[in-house]
Design a protein with these regions (language model features):
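FAD/FMN-dependent oxidoreductases across multiple families
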Residues: 123, 230-304, 311-326, 330-331
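C-terminal helical "tail/cap" subdomain of flavin- and related membrane-associated enzymes
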Residues: 309-438
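Conserved Rossmann-like nucleotide-cofactor binding loop
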Residues: 12, 35, 156
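Short beta-strand to alpha-helix junction loop
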Residues: 88-109, 227-234
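Beta1/beta-strand and adjacent pyrophosphate-binding region of the FAD-binding site
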Residues: 1-12
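Predominantly flavin-linked oxidoreductase catalytic cores and closely associated redox partners
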Residues: 109-248, 284
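N-terminal FAD cofactor-binding segment of flavoenzymes
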Residues: 33-76
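Glycine-rich FAD pyrophosphate-binding loop
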Residues: 7-9, 21-41
Length: 438
């Protein structure tokens, strides 16, 4: 029986664990946290239909109180002079789910299908023979061997970060690759009537990042996010500002009240080695514009499990696993790379530049509602007259779209077979399309 070791109970790893255990693989998930502590104490948006497909549970069978509809949305410019409102109908309303019941559903699904779990066990490093991964070593000195290690241990995964250089997997984290966030749900002291209860701030208080204030039925959800680390003084400063603008925000934290680090860059071009496959945050599987990555991670778990099932009689070499790497980039990664170009172009502008784009309708509701999905070169050229009121800012966004589109085209056409030299040259072309954050 082929042995599968999943490092970390991330979304992608749990999906793969369930699929593989059901198909006769010997699957062990090693997770450093207690089972009951897994999952952020906040909500996220993703495709509920995909979760139903994975778990076999309809939305009516999801845990009671685990999800809700989110209200209408408004994006505010850095100066707060311009507000772009987005109104939803019965068919377009956004659904959000608490992360803890989501993780519980995925764990229960994997357990039901035969996967085994080892909680409260910290992984220290991979066990390697040359460039091949053979298992993991835990912090207490135990060694676990497997035919493949699925790395679902997050952006700072001790498996990935300690891989030998011969794997050629990129471990560098650059400024702008991560989003540092603090999020809490506060009690409400009043019940205001709001057209757009979910307010999103780009360059909030003129700092590179994104924040929001979402007034829910019983709580006020506040996110403070930046591309650079911040501490308690910044949180207090920002909460004072939010309470001034939203005086119904109370002092009591009902949920959350903690930091999170979210990858916001294009996926790794190379995420496999002999006996190793990265998935989820360890491979930067998120949408750069908004940090949403649950859908990408769930799909990655399905793709990886399919490749392993199809090749169950083979050694899980980089050449075999490249099929997973390639399929994910084609099916999921191409748009993420385009999205990064737009995100980095926006974050490289001074706040006055973002104000200009808002106030001259270069950025509109249709662009923001899809996290940049609806903004392309053709639509941007339709805003040429307004944009040319300040060519420097306008062409910075045009350049971001052009470079992002070029990267997306390359992501959609990775080398057909695993050949490191070809992969290196292809990856370097993609790196040449990257927009660097100033």
């Amino acid at each position: 029986m082929r042995k599968i070791l999943v490092a970390g109970a991330g979304h992608s790893g749990l999906v793969a664990a369930a699929e593989l255990a059901q198909n006769g693989f010997d699957v062990l998930v090693i997770e450093k946290e207690k089972k009951e502590n897994l999952g952020h104490d906040w909500e996220d948006r993703f495709d509920f239909g995909l979760l139903s497909r994975i778990t076999g549970k309809s939305i009516e069978e999801f845990p009671e109180g685990s999800w809700r509809f989110r209200g209408n949305c408004a994006f505010l410019s850095p100066s707060k002079r311009k507000k772009i409102e987005i109104f939803y109908n019965e068919n377009t309303r956004q659904k959000v789910m608490w992360r803890k019941p989501l993780i519980r559903m995925l764990i229960e699904n994997a357990e039901r299908r035969g996967a085994k779990f080892l909680f409260e066990t910290e992984i220290a490093a991979p066990l390697c023979e040359g460039a091949a991964v053979k298992g993991v070593k835990t912090a207490d000195g135990n060694e676990f061997y497997a035919d493949i290690v699925i790395d679902s241990a997050g952006v700072f995964s001790p498996v990935k970060m300690n891989l030998p250089g011969e794997t050629h997997i990129d471990k560098e984290i650059r400024r702008g690759d991560l989003f540092y966030g603090w999020r809490a749900y506060f009690n409400k002291t009043d019940r205001p009537e709001l057209k757009t209860p979910f307010e999103v701030y780009l360059y909030h208080e003129r700092e590179q990042g994104l924040s929001w204030c979402c007034t829910n039925e019983n709580t006020v959800d506040i996110l403070i996010g930046r591309i650079d680390k911040f501490g308690e003084d910044k949180i207090k400063e920002q909460l004072d500002i939010f309470r001034h603008d939203h005086p119904w925000t109370g002092e009591e934290i009902i949920n959350g009240g903690n930091y999170g680090v979210i990858p916001v860059r294009r996926p790794l071009t190379l995420m496999v080695a002999d006996g190793y496959a990265a998935a989820g945050d360890s491979a930067f599987m998120t949408m750069p514009m908004n940090g949403m990555g649950i859908d990408l991670s769930l799909n990655a778990g399905l793709i990886l499990a399919d490749v392993l099932k199809t090749n169950s009689e083979k050694e899980f070499t980089a050449a075999v696993l490249w099929e997973y790497n390639r399929r994910f980039l084609i099916e999921q990664g191409a748009f993420a790379s385009k999205n990064e170009g737009l995100k980095n172009a926006l974050l490289s502008l001074p706040y006055e530049g973002v104000d200009f784009l808002f106030e001259n309708n270069v950025i509109q509701a249709s662009d923001l509602s899809g996290a940049g999905k609806n903004m392309n070169f053709k639509t941007l050229m339709g805003k040429f007259v307004n944009g040319m009121k300040n060519p420097k800012y306008f062409f910075a966004i045009v350049n971001g779209l052009i470079k992002g589109s070029g990267a997306a085209s390359l992501y959609a056409n990775p080398p057909e077979k695993f050949n490191y030299e070809k992969i290196r040259k292809w990856s370097e072309k993609i790196e040449g399309k990257a927009v660097k954050i100033i």
